[in-house]
A protein has these predicted regions:
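A short acidic, Gly/Pro-enriched loop at the edge of an enzyme's catalytic core
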Residues: 89-100
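Class I SAM-dependent methyltransferase SAM/SAH-binding core
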Residues: 41, 46-90
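Core SAM-dependent methyltransferase catalytic element
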Residues: 169-188
Length: 188
């Protein structure tokens, strides 16, 4: 267990203020752009907000989280998804199990950025997308010293073997789109 992990209430993860900051529709558009996907792994699924969003788009969704109470909440919100307990650095899935691996505001909680990115690479078939808090002081989210610098994420992604690594600054968040192979230029 790491002190960087979210230990708060489930309800807070779905607060209207927090959801508005995440730009759910825009993030889904960017995550799904330029690739045909059937399966998604939602790492650090929490209350299942992202699992629910992907499932509503017809994708087969599996969520993983370290907290049993989060998994129970996620299952209640997304009964047609599969949820499993596990840690992002040692995911309980075979290589290339999911077309997309998604991390919604959890990559900064990894005990090691390089280790986590390598593990995401291992279980992803096509793409990894991480939504993160920007590297700045903010009223919501983790303290700045837990947040990730864009240059660090991109450097470690390339070192992990990703063929394409992109940082997209959203209105309130940072999005990292990491592809295992060179795909067609992204059209969004």
């Amino acid at each position: 267990m790491t002190d960087k992990r979210y230990g708060g209430e489930i309800e807070r993860l779905r607060s209207p203020e927090r959801v508005a900051l995440m730009e759910v529709d825009r993030v889904l558009e960017l995550a799904l752009a330029g690739v045909t996907l059937k399966s998604v792994l939602d790492v650090g699924t929490g209350s299942g907000l992202w699992a629910e969003a992907f499932a509503q788009r017809g994708l087969s969704v599996t969520g993983v989280d370290v907290r049993e109470d989060m998994l129970a909440a996620a299952q209640a919100f997304v009964p047609n998804a599969t949820f499993k307990q596990g840690e992002m650095e040692t995911l309980p899935f075979p290589d290339e199990s999911f077309d997309l691996v998604f991390l919604g505001l959890v990559l900064h909680e990894a005990t090691g950025l390089a280790t986590a990115l390598r593990e995401m690479y291992r279980v992803a078939n096509l793409r990894v997308v991480a939504l993160e808090w920007p590297y700045e002081v903010g009223e919501m989210g983790p303290p700045q010293d837990h947040r990730l610098r864009a240059e660090d994420v991109l450097r470690e992604a390339r070192a992990a073997g990703y063929a394409q690594a992109e940082h997209i600054q959203l209105a309130h968040m940072a999005l990292y789109r990491l592809d295992k192979r060179n795909l067609q230029p992204w059209c969004v």
